[in-house]
Amino acid sequence: MSIASVASVFKGEHAVGSTVTVRGWVRTRRDSKAGISFLAVYDGSCFNPIQGVVPNSLENYDNEVLKLTAGCSVIVTGDIVESPGAGQAYELQVTAVEVTGWVEDPDTYPMAAKRHSIEHLRELAHLRPRTNIIGAVARVRNCLSQAIHRFYHENGFVWVSTPLITASDCEGAGEMFRVSTLDMENLPRTSDGKVDYDKDFFGKEAFLTVSGQLNGETYACALSKIYTFGPTFRAENSNTSRHLAEFWMVEPEVAFATLNDIAGLAEGMLKYAFNAVLTERMDDLQFFAQHVDKTVIERLQSFVSSDFAQVDYTDAVEILQKSGREFEFPVSWGIDLSSEHERYLAEEHFKAPVVVKNYPKDIKAFYMRLNEDGKTVAAMDVLAPGIGEIIGGSQREERLDVLDMRLEEMDLNKEDYWWYRDLRRYGTVPHAGFGLGFERLVSYVTGVSNIRDVIPFPRAPRTANF
């Protein structure tokens, strides 16, 4: 006898006739008139539960097995047999059922057999992993995460842990969460009435990071190829299906790289990750295709087999203006492309993933390399059919004088970035990188449209339960 996951049984890793023990939770119980009960037991290792055929000859059949309800935790031992029914290859002829946890009141158990709206499940974030949809999201999320780590490891990158607490604003946007140990009811003040952060824990204002990029650049300028993968925070008061206050970012940074180099890196990473999901999590994808978005499998297969198109921002604006389409937001040179513009380019014009490059400098961050025309920067966005922007990146400004000019243009104090400027003073090097919002990637792969449903415990305006 051995402990087995449900997934390992379905994969045929245990011989027919062998005895295994499966530990999990009851999805359903069905009783027959012949004195047999059928337990569907899941353990989260794969989408489908395994069926256990329980005879009434078990000692605890009447007083325990017949009282099992959805959500009860059990340890089931039995012999693996080929299933005569459709839908699964194997089932268990059960020889023992041990109940480890009862559902106290089955009538009030929120995750009982009835269906709940995904909106209602957000209010039950501690229990929603037990549902088919959130369990499948969690497995796909894990698969994508592992694939991204493998991709960078196989390509010689070093994973760098960048700080979550910072004193700098990478985006220059100012929408940051402040970190402080000051007494909010008795704040120390300077002579001009401002909060005296000299008295705070760090001796200065501190924030939760909006990006690991600036810190990542320091390591790329020593280790050549690095990536970060961790949580980031934005105090953006947006209550939409596309925004979270806490989310995860993948941010590679490569020394001696150009914008074209990282565009190629982005394409390689996305295709590698999508291939992993198609190979490893087809059971979950089939559920999403049946119940959430019928195009998910076809979309991923098309993505990995497509060559990425590339277009300059200026040319993209011209394409949009000549499209004959009446957009909600009018198109003109200098605007930041909206989701409707991005999706038109990817879904209708190019009919493929597309990299838009060389954006106007006035709508991009200070650290992006100024192009020779003086009007644009070496920035890129990767647009995917079905969602729009999925990656944003740039070649970084490696020239100190130009970086200082850009900081001044954006009213940022260059002394706050003294250490970042040092990289340009001591052996500066061209380098480039990008950021991938991980939850947006999970949303794209699963077809689950609200980003709050692809992260375990969403943080958003007025939402910080659990």
Curated annotation (Swiss-Prot):
Its EC number is 6.1.1.22. It is an enzyme of class 6 (ligase). InterPro entries: Aa-tRNA-synt_II (IPR004364), aa-tRNA-synth_II (IPR006195), aa-tRNA-synth_II/BPL/LPL (IPR045864), Asn-tRNA-ligase (IPR004522), Asp/Asn-tRNA-synth_IIb (IPR002312), NA-bd_OB-fold (IPR012340), NA-bd_OB_tRNA (IPR004365). GO terms for cellular component: cytoplasm. The keyword Cytoplasm applies. It comes from the Bacteria. The keyword ATP-binding applies. Keywords: Aminoacyl-tRNA synthetase, ATP-binding, Cytoplasm, Ligase, Nucleotide-binding, Protein biosynthesis. PROSITE patterns: AA_TRNA_LIGASE_II. One of its GO terms (biological process) is asparaginyl-tRNA aminoacylation. One of its GO terms (molecular function) is ATP binding. It catalyses: tRNA(Asn) + L-asparagine + ATP = L-asparaginyl-tRNA(Asn) + AMP + diphosphate + H(+). It is found in: Cytoplasm. Belongs to the class-II aminoacyl-tRNA synthetase family. HAMAP family: Asn_tRNA_synth. NCBIfam families: asnS, PRK03932.1. Homodimer. This is Asparagine--tRNA ligase. It comes from Shewanella oneidensis (strain ATCC 700550 / JCM 31522 / CIP 106686 / LMG 19005 / NCIMB 14063 / MR-1).
